Amino acid sequence: MVLLAAKGLSLLDVNPGLVVWTLVTFLVVVLVLKKFAWDVILKALDERAETVQNDIKKASELRLEAEALLKDYEARLNSAKDEANAIVAEAKSDALKLKNKLLEETNGEVKAQKDQAVKEIELAKAKALGQLQAQIVEMTITVAAKVLEKQLKSEDYKAFIETELDKLGKLSA
């Protein structure tokens, strides 16, 4: 600008000759481009536009497919969670049933052992009472025989009874 201003030319001045030659040059360039390059340029632009449209379409299809896959994944995940919860609930139920069954079996065994112990105690008690009764009968017979053998005085009789009762107490203890 400084050089043009120094020569006396201004950028804002219109030179009619320069305008004509600029237009002629522009038209020649446009005609040459139209004849040799315009179809190639338009074809490249059309191909690029078509590629962009195809890419947009593919991206849209992929987005829809991804959304469908996401929904399917979420449905499967929820199904798996429900199934896992059902398995856990069933396992808890089975464990509770097994616990109750084992408790019933254990209680049955304990009751059977208790009943067996009670029977054994009753048998031992009956046997001990039978033996005690036999000893009492034997002692009574012995006492009666001794009493009949000799006539005791009442003091001797009391001492004899106390002695025999002491023997009986020692046997039952």
From Swiss-Prot:
Q: Which InterPro entries match?
A: ATP_synth_b/b'su_bac/chlpt, ATP_synth_F0_bsu_bac, ATP_synthase_B_chain
| Gene Ontology cellular-component annotations | plasma membrane; proton-transporting ATP synthase complex
* UniProt-listed Pfam families: ATP-synt_B
State the compartments where it is located. Answer: Cell inner membrane
GO molecular function list: proton-transporting ATP synthase activity, rotational mechanism; proton-transporting ATPase activity, rotational mechanism
Q: What is its main location?
A: membrane
Its biological purpose: F(1)F(0) ATP synthase produces ATP from ADP in the presence of a proton or sodium gradient. F-type ATPases consist of two structural domains, F(1) containing the extramembraneous catalytic core and F(0) containing the membrane proton channel, linked together by a central stalk and a peripheral stalk. During catalysis, ATP synthesis in the catalytic domain of F(1) is coupled via a rotary mechanism of the central stalk subunits to proton translocation.
Instruction: Give the NCBIfam families listed for this entry.
Output: ATP_synt_b, PRK13460.1
Name of this chain's protein: ATP synthase subunit b
The organism is Leptospira interrogans serogroup Icterohaemorrhagiae serovar copenhageni (strain Fiocruz L1-130)
The organism's lineage is: Bacteria, Pseudomonadati, Spirochaetota, Spirochaetia, Leptospirales
Q: Which gene encodes it?
A: atpF
